[in-house]
Regions:
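Surface-exposed beta-strand edges and their flanking turn/coil or helix-capping segments
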Residues: 33-35, 43-47, 72-74, 92-95, ...
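Short, low-complexity intrinsically disordered segments
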Residues: 15-17, 102, 150, 188
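Conserved mid-domain beta->alpha element of the FAD-binding
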Residues: 67-133
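Long, low-complexity C-terminal extensions of enzymes
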Residues: 107-244
């Protein structure tokens, strides 16, 4: 049977990006686009053209305005999930942010009247989580080398949050990517996007020079061998009805 790719593709388009999610019985596709740069009919035409004969249904339109609450906990109401905010789905943060909203709320559930200090702490935690997700999303766009449409030219000139600008410049100048413990996205995720988008470092961490000769090559060789052995033992992704 034909194997199913075990990953989702994100494909840059004229005014946004297209997702392609392999499912057991079909491929899920969608186009997240900026209505400031492309109208609905143009977006539908671009998506339909990319799918060709594989399209099975008329595209549905889901409009959204990204953002978050100024205060997630206000008096006796706490906003969770889509009531709290929504960021575009490039990194699928909605479920995780909903879980964080519940997880961080549980220790603060009051027996009586809410403690305003706890309310403030909760709001600060949730605001920080959304800001972290926002910065990581913006990273994908500002580091893109595309300049062929107005959308991508605007992305290159977007105002970056201070934390994002600092991290990009730190990596470019030193080769280091410092991510505080407990952040939404790990150091590996940040490095994968920056290096994948062509952000290069002028230097590398000094401790690479003090390692014994051949140590790094030996370590990377063993790591590659481990991955290759694991891959040999893994089964292909295939439709459930065709799996043996």
């Amino acid at each position: 049977p034909e194997s199913i790719p075990p990953y989702t593709r994100s494909i840059a388009k004229e005014a946004g990006w297209q997702w392609e999610i392999p499912l057991s019985h079909r491929n899920g596709n969608g186009y997240v686009f900026s209505s400031r740069h492309l109208d609905l009919d143009q977006a539908k035409a671009e998506l339909t053209k990319s799918l060709g004969d594989s399209i099975e249904a008329e595209p549905r339109v889901i409009r959204f305005k990204p953002g978050k609450r100024q205060r997630f906990w206000e008096k006796n109401c706490v906003a969770i999930g889509l009531a709290a905010g929504f960021l575009e789905p490039l990194e699928s943060t909605a479920i995780h942010l909903s879980q964080l909203g519940i997880f961080w709320l549980l220790p603060f559930l009051p027996n009586g009247r809410p403690c305003q200090e706890e309310v403030s702490v909760y709001n600060e935690q949730m605001t920080s989580a959304y800001e972290q997700a926002k910065s990581f999303l913006i990273l994908h766009y500002v580091t893109s080398e595309r300049r062929d449409t107005q959308f991508w030219r605007d992305c290159a000139n977007v105002e970056m949050p201070g934390m994002l600008r600092t991290r990009i410049e730190m990596f470019r100048q030193t080769g280091r990517c410092y991510i505080p413990e407990g952040e939404l996205f790990s150091q590996g995720s940040w490095l994968a996007v920056m290096m994948g988008q062509g952000v290069s470092a002028d230097q590398y961490p000094f401790f690479a020079d003090i390692a014994k000769e051949g140590l790094l090559e030996d370590y990377m060789g063993k790591l590659l061998q481990t991955y290759e052995q694991e891959l040999l033992q893994m089964k292909e992704h295939s439709p459930p009805q065709l799996s043996s």
